[in-house]
């Protein structure tokens, strides 16, 4: 079930406060955040936000196409090691 439209999108209050301060001053600075659940709003476009993935902060440059998505969608929490070869599964030695 999606969020009620009368509530509006969720954005961490501290994060939106930092974005508004940077918009007023015109500064382009990387903002660290742990709020992966925050929705990207049009005010954030053009800023770089470092989103925590559980291990480190991943810098994400916000574009217009990202508006409406969550910050956590752009900072992956798992590493994909790749699929194993069929020969490795059977225990054969590849020559």
Swiss-Prot record:
PROSITE patterns: RIBOSOMAL_S19
A Pfam family reported for this protein in Swiss-Prot or TrEMBL: Ribosomal_S19
Statement: the UniProt record of this protein carries the keyword Transport: no
Assigned keywords, A-Z: Ribonucleoprotein, Ribosomal protein, RNA-binding, rRNA-binding
Span of the signal peptide: none
Organism: Fervidobacterium nodosum (strain ATCC 35602 / DSM 5306 / Rt17-B1)
Designated name of the protein: Small ribosomal subunit protein uS19
Family to which the UniProt record says this protein belongs: Belongs to the universal ribosomal protein uS19 family.
Name of the coding gene: rpsS
Record's function text: Protein S19 forms a complex with S13 that binds strongly to the 16S ribosomal RNA.
GO cellular component, one term: cytoplasm
InterPro entries noted in UniProt: Ribosomal_uS19, Ribosomal_uS19_bac-type, Ribosomal_uS19_CS, Ribosomal_uS19_SF
NCBIfam families assigned to the protein according to its UniProt record, in alphabetical order: rpsS_bact (TIGR01050)
GO molecular function, one term: structural constituent of ribosome
GO biological-process terms attached to the record: ribosomal small subunit assembly; translation
